């Protein structure tokens, strides 16, 4: 079966979901989940996209991202999945399939849509009985480990990539909170 074509718009914000290979609970291991989380934010710090929300569940991830003007959503997801696969293989000393091919996306339309998807991301571990409160789950945006980017329409920020004239003033945020 052919993978669906993604039709992404430069500067738009997306809710993205991707699953592990055969829905295996790879990210139940905190060290592996940390590798993925660090990969997401190192790609962000390199100016590839903005990260507004994320959650790393045992067998899938949800993110709200705004790709850079010269980075497609497909490329952003490829950077995260490909880089994390290599880093996980190195840490484990062996290669094994991490990711299911492809991903699903939903373009965020307005503030209400952004708020409802943010709430869904933050509450995902509570619904799965992995935490009692969103901020108790260590591999998600509600935990507060990483500085998040404001949603561009709400903040006036531009999509990243310094090659784009509108984003020249955008500076990468430090990944970890002081």
Task: Please give the residue ranges for each predicted region.
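Short catalytic/metal-binding and nucleic-acid-binding patches
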Residues: 1-178
């Amino acid at each position: 079966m052919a993978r669906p074509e993604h039709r992404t718009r430069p500067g738009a914000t997306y809710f993205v979901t991707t699953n592990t290979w055969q829905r295996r609970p790879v990210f139940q291991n905190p060290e592996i989940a940390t590798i993925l989380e660090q990969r997401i934010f190192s790609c962000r710090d390199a100016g590839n996209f903005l990260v507004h929300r994320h959650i790393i569940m045992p067998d899938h991830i949800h993110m709200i991202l705004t790709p850079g003007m010269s980075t497609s959503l497909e490329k952003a997801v490829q950077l995260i999945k490909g880089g994390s696969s290599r880093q996980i293989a190195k840490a484990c000393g062996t290669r094994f399939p991490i990711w299911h091919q492809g991903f699903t996306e939903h373009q965020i339309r307005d503030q209400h849509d952004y708020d409802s998807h943010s709430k869904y991301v933050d509450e995902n571990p509570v619904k799965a009985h992995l935490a009692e409160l969103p901020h108790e789950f260590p591999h998600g945006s509600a935990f507060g480990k990483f500085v998040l980017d404001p949603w561009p329409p709400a903040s006036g920020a531009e999509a990243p990539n310094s090659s784009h004239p509108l984003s020249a003033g955008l500076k990468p945020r430090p990944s970890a909170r002081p």
